[in-house]
Amino acid sequence: MKVISSIQELRDQLRGQNRTAFVPTMGNLHEGHLSLMRLARQHGDPVVASIFVNRLQFGPNEDFDKYPRTLQDDIEKLQKENVYVLFAPTERDMYPEPQEYRVLPPDDLGGILEGEFRPGFFAGVCTVVTKLMSCVQPRVAVFGKKDYQQLMIVRRMCQQLALPVDIIAAETVRDEDGLALSSRNRYLTTDERKEAPELAKTLQRVRDGVLGGERDLGKLEQTARTHLAERGWAPDYISIRRRANLIAPSAAELEAGEPLVVLAAAKLGATRLIDNLEI
């Protein structure tokens, strides 16, 4: 596996490749990330991964400086997955001058849920993903469903900008107790780690309620928020939305069996966790 930081060297290395499968990451890789590499291999060859902690998608009070950086461990894991190239640029490589041009998602998708609680987050994501796509020029790119809203925004962005890349969705990988794998799980204390699977269990109860015929979605959402709050969580949102566009479903759509997803974000101690479950 080649480890490359220069955009020009990356382009030289990939020249002539027309089936490249790309997996962008911020590093601190876990089994969820590695499953993306394996899925990428099913859809293209060679597989290219990137590791770049993107300052643009962190808010002023977020964890950019303490975000785990484990490059050597990550390299070893990617080598075992037979990744062809790891693109690991520095900030100077990616942003040699102030990034004044940004890619802004529409408010109807980028300003809700995560976008409401993390202003500017999706503009940072869209900008860096567009730039990475320009560098790698893949045929397919793989994103995890754990970041459901991000997946939808990136997919729509590629369609709207006519980027010649297919976005592949990968299922969320969970620990044995149901907790969705995340680089931020390492921030949890021992007691918090024991409590953390309750987020997934709460989403499962919401899902069961909808499938059981409950049509008062607001009641289901409020019950779930209250349940987590009583256990010491600080929920940002628990919301049932249409899978197609993350808009709240109408009563008619509910009766017609509209495909739904319940999404959640909540703080447990100092750690903010997100999860979702399709219904």
UniProtKB/Swiss-Prot annotation:
(R)-pantoate binds at residues 57, 150. The keyword ATP-binding applies. It is an enzyme of class 6 (ligase). Pathway: Cofactor biosynthesis; (R)-pantothenate biosynthesis; (R)-pantothenate from (R)-pantoate and beta-alanine: step 1/1. One of its GO terms (biological process) is pantothenate biosynthetic process. One of its GO terms (cellular component) is cytosol. Disulfide bonds: none annotated. The keyword ATP-binding applies. Catalyzes the condensation of pantoate with beta-alanine in an ATP-dependent reaction via a pantoyl-adenylate intermediate. The reaction proceeds by a bi uni uni bi ping pong mechanism. NCBIfam families: cyt_tran_rel (TIGR00125), panC (TIGR00018). This is Pantothenate synthetase. It comes from Burkholderia ambifaria (strain MC40-6).
